[in-house]
Design a protein with these regions (language model features):
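Acidic/His-enriched low-complexity segments
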Residues: 1-190
Length: 190
C-alpha cells in the first residue's frame, strides 16, 4: 500500500482475487450548508468474495475511523489512499466508517455555496477514479456490483441518485433518503 495510483498489474491481480457482490453506502450530508464544515461521514459496507488472504479498498479522505471485517473490529491500516484488509475468507463483509472532504475542484462530491441565492448545491463527478473520494470502494471499472445509497441531508433538499427513492424519512430539519439498489455498475457511474 504505497500509492494513490493503481497499476495495471495491481488491478489485474485484484480482479482475479476479488468478486464484489454489493455496496451499501451511507452519506451524512446534513452539515453541507455550513461553509465551515469541510467534510462528511461516509459509511460503506461491501460484500465480496476473495481467493486471496489480503486486498485493499480505495479511499481518499482525511480519516478512516473504523473498519469491521466479518463482524470483528480490526486495526485501521490506512495510508491516505488504501485501506488494507487481511485475514480474508471466501465470503467477506467489511464496513468502513470514514470522513470524506467536500470538493471545490469537481472531483468527488463537489460543494458549491451560491452567493446569488445563498444556497448550497452538491454534485458528484467520479470519472475516472474519484468515487474513492466519497466512499471506500474497489475503484476499478471492471469490478461492478449493485449499489444501495442512503443519504441524510437537510430537509427540503432534492436528493437524487441512479435509482428511484425506496424510502424517505423526515427527521425535523433533516431527511434520510434510501434509494433502490442499482443493477451491477462501476463505481465511477454511481
Amino acid at each position: 500500500m504505497e500509492s494513490a495510483n493503481l497499476t495495471r498489474a495491481e488491478t489485474a491481480e485484484r480482479s482475479r482475487a476479488v468478486s464484489v457482490r454489493s455496496y451499501h453506502v451511507e452519506l451524512d450530508l446534513r452539515g453541507a450548508p455550513d461553509a465551515g464544515n469541510p467534510g462528511f461521514t461516509t459509511t460503506t459496507t461491501v460484500e465480496f468474495s476473495a481467493t486471496a488472504d489480503a486486498t485493499w479498498l480505495d479511499f481518499l479522505g482525511p480519516a478512516v475511523e473504523s473498519v469491521v471485517l466479518n463482524g470483528a473490529a480490526v486495526p485501521v491500516r490506512y495510508d491516505g489512499a488504501r485501506i488494507g484488509l487481511s485475514g480474508l475468507r471466501a465470503h467477506n463483509v467489511v464496513t468502513v466508517v470514514a470522513t470524506a472532504s467536500y470538493s471545490r475542484s469537481g472531483e468527488g462530491l463537489h460543494r458549491y455555496l451560491d452567493p446569488a441565492d445563498g444556497r448550497t448545491y452538491l454534485y458528484t463527478q467520479y470519472e475516472p477514479a474519484d468515487a474513492r473520494r466519497v466512499f471506500a470502494c474497489f475503484e476499478q471499472p471492471d469490478m461492478k456490483a449493485p449499489f444501495t445509497f442512503v443519504v441524510s441531508a437537510p430537509a427540503g433538499w432534492q436528493v437524487l441518485s441512479n435509482q428511484h427513492v425506496a424510502e424517505r424519512e423526515s427527521l425535523g430539519d433533516a431527511q434520510t433518503v434510501k434509494f433502490a439498489p442499482t443493477l451491477p455498475i462501476s463505481t465511477y457511474i454511481t
